[in-house]
Amino acid sequence: MNQNFSSMIDRYKYQQLRIGSVSPQQISAWANKILPNGEIVGEVTKPYTFHYKTNKPEKDGLFCERISGPIKSGICACGNYRVIGDEKEGPKFCEQCGVESVDSRIRRYQMGYIKLACPVTHVWYLKRLPSYIANLLDKPLKELEGLVYCDFSFARPIAKKPTFLRLRGSFEYEIQSRKYSIPLFFTTQGFDTFRNREISTGASAIREQLADPDLRIIMDRSLVEWKELGEEGSTGNAWEDRKIGRRKDFLVKRMELAKHFLRTNVEPERMVLCLLPVLPPELRPIIQIDGGKPMSSDINELYRRVIYRNNTLTDPLTTSRSTPGELVLCQEKLVQEAVDTLLDNGIRGQPMRDGHNKVYKSFSDVIEGKEGRFRETLLGKRVDYSGRSVIVVGPSLSLHRCGLPREIAIELFQTFVIRGLIRQRVASNIGIAKSKIREKEPIVWEILQEVMRGHPVLLNRAPTLHRLGIQAFQPIIGEGRAICLHPLVRKGFNADFDGDQMAVHVPLSLEAQTEARLLMFSHMNLLSPAIGDPISVPTQDMLIGLYVLTIGNHRGICANRYNPCNYRNYQNETVDDNNYQYTKEKEPHFCSSYDALGAYRQKRINLYSPLWLRWRLDQRVIASREVPIEVQYESLGTYHEIYGHYQIVRSIKKEILCIYIRTTIGHISFYREIEEAVQGFCRAYSYGT
């Protein structure tokens, strides 16, 4: 096992993953390994995978066992078996085939590399927006693309010597003899010396330009230019002002990019590749489907294309010195395009397709998007002690509670229930405990409720865009197959009760449970973390419900007193009681809200029936300048002053005996809920102080 790479992915030592450009030396250190016989392996030089007769990996190919390790643990390519880790069996190495006797899992992380015959620009840094190479060099992207793909060249700064650009320009203006003699020079052996000395093209030209400038000088010059543009002010021309604004934004991005390279100690020339890493074989497998037909990952075919073209370029550079320069440039362009297709198929236009007109999946297609390696496998992987279901409204729940279906609850807390069954000696072992859970015995639900009483759960709704996307709740067993939520927590999750799903997780460690209780409970996250406004406010269904609850008695006594339609709200019988008087002709009078709610439960009045409720002697209820609508006198001398929404009972001496307010059962219910909530808050506050 490569110690450098294994230490890099040690999950106990490292708790983060950083993605960035890597130097050729680091790629070589990850991929190269020294065999016991002193041979260094790691470079993939052949575009082959498996031999068609023996069905074994080809030597120095994409699945070579010498580079990536054995396919079967302890078995080399010859078929000999050696016990892994047994020193008595001799060296863990087959001298005949050169394969180490190690665990086959090494093929999941042992890399290889391809030594490119020419530098290749990384297409992510060139074509992706923003183009880091174009920003750093302060050159148009189209010009850099033409340079990378060998469409034109630039002259190296050599004084008093002809340059390639001057010679190409002289073709149109020089005499006819020189027009035909100079191109012949480019097919001679002397052209190589001239080309390497005076002209530069392809990715090597980009690499030279990236390695040349000082990043601190780039930052200083960009800052000076930005200040000069800022001092100029408005030109009066809208188009020129927008152009200056775009230039200033570009300079800011350029300074940030140069600062990033300095801070991370990354050399800009790493954006041009000299060594191309080869993924471990297990991450790009070849499998056999029904009928023995092999099915390969698209990455393998793209790697083969790169190796074919790279070898085609390597042969004339190493064996023949009479190869025309234009042919070499053309082959370098093909290598660049092959690597582009491997990294990001289709970024330069039409994507590469197979024989069935199917687009090959490149590195970018494998790792990006919802089904990519990061979001699906690393970030969105399935975890234990978690479930998922549709959310519905639980209006009777407290703000910090949620209702879990029985199926989800028993599955999430199964291990805790098993421990409880064994502790209470209901079951003697795990097997018997599981059988009792499957049979759904009553004792199981009792233990489950006891376990859930002291264990919070986490609810998460994707996408988790802010911290309120994950909140903690105290679970209770609910009926049905959906997760019940208080409607006030809907806004924090940005959820709707129209089929949205939520995931539920069980925090296992004591630290996680403490964090859930102290920081993540829903009743402790009532304010928006972004702007500080209340986020647990009634919306949608709750507002409609409150409106319907209090819709009665909104036009006063004058609109309803003599309206025959209101008579259907009253019963035909006369009820005489000490607490209230109820007749067909009169609106009922109640001494307390409990009496009114009792009459509603007995269906003597409905939710919207106007009634008179005795109220405390509060002068704020009485409007001093209001004139009574009607005054009713009784035989004992007392009289009632009836106003729009209240009435005052006075004695003969005009003293106020009592006050009645005109309301409905809906208003009473709403008021009592608010009153109980305020009293509960005051009690909690007094206990806390």
From Swiss-Prot:
Any Pfam family matching the protein: RNA_pol_Rpb1_2
- Protein name (record): DNA-directed RNA polymerase subunit beta'
Instruction: State the taxonomy lineage.
Output: Eukaryota, Viridiplantae, Streptophyta, Embryophyta, Tracheophyta
Subcellular location, record wording = Plastid, Chloroplast
GO terms, molecular function: DNA binding; DNA-directed RNA polymerase activity; magnesium ion binding; zinc ion binding
Q: Provide the Gene Ontology terms for cellular component.
A: chloroplast; DNA-directed RNA polymerase complex; mitochondrion
SMART domains referenced in this protein's UniProt entry, alphabetically:
RPOLA_N
The yes or no answer to whether the keyword Transcription is present is: yes
